[in-house]
Amino acid sequence: SKAKEHFGISYLRPYQELVIRHILEAEENEVESNLLVCLPTGSGKSICFMLPSLIIKKKTIIIYPLLSLMKDQENRFRNAGIPAITLKGGMDKDILSFEINRFLSEEASVLITNPEMLLYLIESNRIKKAQGNISMMIIDEAHTSIVWGESFRESFLKLPDIIDYLQPKHISAYTATMDKRIESGIIKLIFKSTTPYII
């Protein structure tokens, strides 16, 4: 199996199987899917979106709040043999252009970034070719979009604009921290008040 070959795991945990099957069945049936997944840190949630991105073989965007998480995830994808790029603020202009082109072509299928960079790419018209061509959009640590968006990271409150622009087919929000306020905030912000499939 691909899980064994690329990630060195012999079996999927029940919740991993549930998430992965939900995404793959939606893809197979050519329908959109919305997922809100609450799993504790260290529970193997990355497999939930890494394996589908490997199987579907279409473009995936993963949004992270922290640079350290972005680098970690890029290494995981690369170790699994999945071509991934990371775009963040402060990059050399030539390197940024080179990496954007890798993602827009067939060279890299996964973009790991943050809301600020995506807003910059949209406003500067540099990611227009990806419009309507994004299979999966993953928002990891989704609780931060509510907690931080209300205080010092207003870019998180523009996630609906990013989603509207890029038109991803499958949207998944992951968090390890979710009370009723956070849950309703995520549903309102990311899923525009349409109740997602909650795991």
Feature map (PLM): residue ranges:
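Conserved pre-motif I regulatory segment
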Residues: 1-38
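Pre-Walker A (Motif I) flank of P-loop NTPase domains
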Residues: 26-37, 58-60, 108-109, 169-170
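Conserved catalytic network of the ASCE P-loop NTPase/AAA+ motor domain
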Residues: 28-30, 53-55, 77-79, 101-106, ...
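Walker A/P-loop
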Residues: 29-51, 174, 178
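Conserved Walker A/P-loop ATP-binding site and its immediately adjacent core
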Residues: 46-47, 57-91, 95, 116-119, ...
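Conserved motor-coupling elements within RecA-like helicase/translocase cores
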Residues: 94-111
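SF2 helicase catalytic motif II
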Residues: 111, 115-170
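Interdomain hinge/linker at the junction between the two RecA-like core domains of SF2 helicases
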Residues: 161-165, 170, 177-199
